[in-house]
Amino acid sequence: LTDPASTSGNLLPRVSFTKVIGADLEDYFSRVVYTGGHDLSAVAVFEGQVDAAFVATHRLDNVLDRGIASMEDYVVLWSSPVIPQDPFVVNGRLCPELIDQIQNAFLSLTDSAEGQKYLKNVNASKFVPMTDADYDIIRDLKAAKDAKKN
């Protein structure tokens, strides 16, 4: 696992993957550790410090892009449902025109060379508008984890 506060590196595996294997992670694996981050988890697998890890795809891409390892060094055993990435938010008290300008600036990054360079630097292809409902999967995962505690 990556970090106790990580959605894709802790919460999602503890809820979704445990449904696949029919057991808690600590009962299924001989040892469960937190590495401190997705990149560190991918490197730990590559270096043989752990046998497997739950790593966000874009974080594995970071390790591959830096030349630390290649995709041939890994076998993907399970892929989770898609979850939304971290949002960019603004204060809702801003005037609607300014909010629209800020949103349009993000949504139009693909339209310029400078914007495309920024997207490449953050390992993204584009920004998309999100709604509160898009994050229901995160709320559902947390509710399922909390229910397991009780």
What are these regions (language model features)?
Residues L12, S16, L40, A44, ...:
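Extracytoplasmic/secreted proteins, especially bacterial periplasmic and envelope-associated proteins
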Residues S30-R31, L64-V82:
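Short beta-strand->loop
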Residues T57-H58, G92:
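Short secondary-structure boundary segments
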Residues L1-A42, V50, H58:
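Bilobed "Venus flytrap"/periplasmic-binding protein-like clamshell domains
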Residues L1-T7, F46-V50, V89-N91, A124-P129:
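Second-shell loop/turn segments in exported
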Residues D86:
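Catalytic-face loop-and-helix region of soluble metabolic enzyme cores
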Residues V89-V90, L94-N150:
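An extracytoplasmic/periplasmic, membrane-proximal ligand-sensing/linker region
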